[in-house]
């Protein structure tokens, strides 16, 4: 029997929708234009000032947008911008289409949010999967696009073609914690209870939490039903699933905790989705 699900009020969730900020690439271009404009004006009005003097005067104003920007903000504002500025060998996209009821989504895989790739592949063994991975030897954070800005065409298509999405993420903390959010509040609560019963440090987030993932702009919430579960795992917890937590070694050093955890998630999906 299909279970009754409780939706989040999407209008209320929209209040916390992330305002799209200019990317750092865009800010840099604007700064160059501002530099040219200021240089010409100063040079005309005060021709006796040297070029070095002009640069000293205007440099603080050019750097101001970068100091004001959130340190964790994306470098790029869209996938198209990322693709135009990054080497194609530095990222990969993997997809598999199966039952349209559930899509396993991991848009920060590889070295971006380490461990989410391996978890997504295992959980989606017999399910639909979308996976974006950063493959740089270092600096994969440059490939991070927030869920509200991730607009890679295949990802958007697959999300819309599935009725529910389970989105895997990682956040930086040495503590071992799992934060459960998403718009599918009933199933999110059920999953939290299941994880707790199996001994995992899970907590259900309120819709106002920054990791709740309930914004209508969030890619995971653009499925045919608008229902999602977002699983945010701390660095400490993700590290506990592998014997060696490096990009090249994670796939071959998944430990018993990894397989117990992914089986718990997989069994939950089988029992609660049709």
Each language-model region and where it sits:
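N-terminal targeting leaders characterized by basic, low-complexity, disordered sequences
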Residues: 1-7
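Polybasic, lysine-rich low-complexity intrinsically disordered segments
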Residues: 11, 20-21
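Positively charged N-terminal leader segments that act as targeting/secretion signals
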Residues: 21-26, 53
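Bacterial N-terminal signal peptides that target proteins for export
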Residues: 46-54
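Bacterial N-terminal signal peptides
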Residues: 56-65
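N-terminal catalytic or cofactor-binding beta/alpha core of small enzyme domains
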Residues: 69-274
